[in-house]
Amino acid sequence: MHEVRVLAFQKIYSIDINQSAMDDIFDIFNIEDKGLDIENESIKSFYSSLVNGTFNNLEHIDSLIRDISWNWSLDRMDKVDLAILRMGVYSLKFQNFENSKRAVIDDAILIAKKYGSKNSCKFINGILDALLKNMEN
């Protein structure tokens, strides 16, 4: 499902950067062009869950990021990093991935390697790992 996470990250980033509405979360990115079957309900549902869930829980997600990222305000964070973090926090906190929470973090790191800056991976790993440890305690 890495490809679906990449598309969801791109949509989350696009909505944030363009300050656009979420009227149709499938409007900007043609999932079929990415080799994914949009008619597959599990793919469509997972994508929708990531995008809608992230924005529906944005206040809580941002609060968690602020609590963990000590000296970083959300305004100072790179928008790519913030989009990856928001989606990662949503997945860890609200989706049922009991056996694969580490995989959520690994996926976020892979996305950061491709789309983020040279320090994005460490930054994102640190915050998501701290959140996971807090959740386990």
Curated annotation (Swiss-Prot):
Region forming the signal peptide: none
Gene Ontology molecular-function annotations: RNA binding
InterPro entries, per the entry: NusB-like_sf (IPR035926), NusB_fam (IPR011605), NusB_RsmB_TIM44 (IPR006027)
GO BP terms: DNA-templated transcription termination; transcription antitermination
GO cellular component, one term: cytosol
Superkingdom in the source lineage: Bacteria
Alphabetic keyword roster: RNA-binding, Transcription, Transcription antitermination, Transcription regulation
NCBIfam families: nusB
HAMAP family documented for this protein: NusB
UniProt family annotation: Belongs to the NusB family.
Record function comment: Involved in transcription antitermination. Required for transcription of ribosomal RNA (rRNA) genes. Binds specifically to the boxA antiterminator sequence of the ribosomal RNA (rrn) operons.
Protein name: Transcription antitermination protein NusB
Organism from which the protein derives: Borreliella afzelii (strain PKo)
Lineage: Bacteria, Pseudomonadati, Spirochaetota, Spirochaetia, Spirochaetales
